[in-house]
Amino acid sequence: MTTATTLGDAVFSLNMTRGEDALYKSSGAIVAAIVVVVIIIVTLVLILLKMYNRRMRTRRELEPKSPKPPVPPALDPSSNGSQQPATVTFDPANVHVETR
């Protein structure tokens, strides 16, 4: 396709060959093919991850369960097994605020 345009005394000619025209027309098909390939690759990766997850879960469920490790004794020997959580009490009367 040849188009001639006159602007004042200059003539501009635009030549589009059949190869360029075919390339412009097929660029949409190329993009669509790339998108399809990417979707196929992502699908395959998800299927592989699902199979791996299923295999690891069955392996964890089938392996013998080891008993829990023994609980370490209390640090204070005089506690005699009765452990009470440490408590902190807050008394506002004991708080000294510096005045300026």
UniProtKB/Swiss-Prot annotation:
Residues 1-28 are extracellular. The keyword Glycoprotein applies. Residues 50-100 are cytoplasmic. Induction: Up-regulated in Schwann cells by EGR2 during nerve development and after nerve injury. It comes from the Eukaryota. The keyword Membrane applies. Plays a role in myelin formation. This is Noncompact myelin-associated protein. Found in the peripheral nervous system (PNS) Schwann cells (at protein level). Expressed in the PNS, primarily limited to Schwann cells. Glycosylated. GO terms for molecular function: structural constituent of myelin sheath. Keywords: Cell membrane, Glycoprotein, Membrane, Transmembrane, Transmembrane helix. The chain crosses the membrane at residues 29-49. InterPro entries: NCMAP (IPR038940). One of its GO terms (cellular component) is plasma membrane. PANTHER family: NONCOMPACT MYELIN-ASSOCIATED PROTEIN (PTHR35974:SF1). It is a single-pass type I membrane protein. It is found in: Cell membrane. Residues 58-100 are annotated as: Disordered.
